[in-house]
Amino acid sequence: MRQAEFDGKGSCIRWTEATGAEPARVYVHGLGSASTVYNAHIAARSELAGRRTLFVDLPGHGISDRPADFGYALEDHADALAAALDEAGVTAAELVAHSMGGAVAIVLAHRRPELVSRLVLVEANLDPYPPVKAGSSGIASYTEEEYVENGGHARVLDKVGPSWAATMRLADPRALHRTAIGLVRGTVPTMRHLLEELTADRVYLQGALSGELVNREELEAAGVRVVTVPGAGHNVMFDNPDVLVAEVAGKV
């Protein structure tokens, strides 16, 4: 396990790492998740062997610290991720990023383009104030006090089911709520616009069971390769890992 300070006050973002050839692959998890749980089985596949691999837990999640005075906006998470990559000596990384982690990865690539050579985005959040879907956590519908102090966190853990709750319960409730609020608020310009403007190689995976990706044609016109993953919902890495592995390996 390695760590890097991210807030100037001693709080650390942490990751586990496997040695290998550059460029490094960096796996970034979604809201209430953890990198190794969602990605270790992907990185372990023979098609992806031999590359330096980092499994990063964002602030407030997994093994990383969760300071109460941190903002947890997408930009804050991106800066913390940059601190981890700087400490690790990583540049021109390939980021494999899921959901909220995909939004963070887009912001990172915009703010620190030298750190990112390729984005493999798995149902990344692209737009602010998205419509509420079945299976969403609903965290942002609570005030911070309701969520942290008045039972909101427990209700959400019951709602999301045992698999998501298994990692969500490891996240700090206050950090989780602020992260959810930051995700709903998004960025200015939007994550979608930032993604369209990037020059790095970009792949976006959309689970077929999640429906059509909004404004897919505009993304493709901007050079983003959009892949619909058969038989998969939001968690492509569990529903159809073969497609994700092939895309990460660049063998499609």
Question: Where are the regions a protein language model picked out?
Answer:
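Conserved HGGG/HGGXW glycine-rich cap/lid loop of the alpha/beta-hydrolase fold
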Residues: K9-D65
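Active-site loop/oxyanion-hole signature of alpha/beta-hydrolase fold enzymes
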Residues: K9-S11, A49-V96, A246
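Conserved catalytic-core motifs of eukaryotic protein kinase domains, centered on the activation segment
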Residues: V37-N39, S64-F70, P130-K133, N215-R216
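Gly/Ala-rich beta-loop-alpha elbow adjacent to hydrolase catalytic centers
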Residues: A97, G101, A105
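Flexible "cap/lid" loop of the alpha/beta hydrolase fold
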Residues: I106-R111, L115-Y147
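Conserved alpha/beta-hydrolase catalytic His-Asp/Glu region
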Residues: P130-S136, E144-E197
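Conserved serine/cysteine hydrolase catalytic core
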Residues: R174-P230, M237
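Catalytic histidine-centered segment of alpha/beta-hydrolase-like enzymes
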Residues: A232-V245
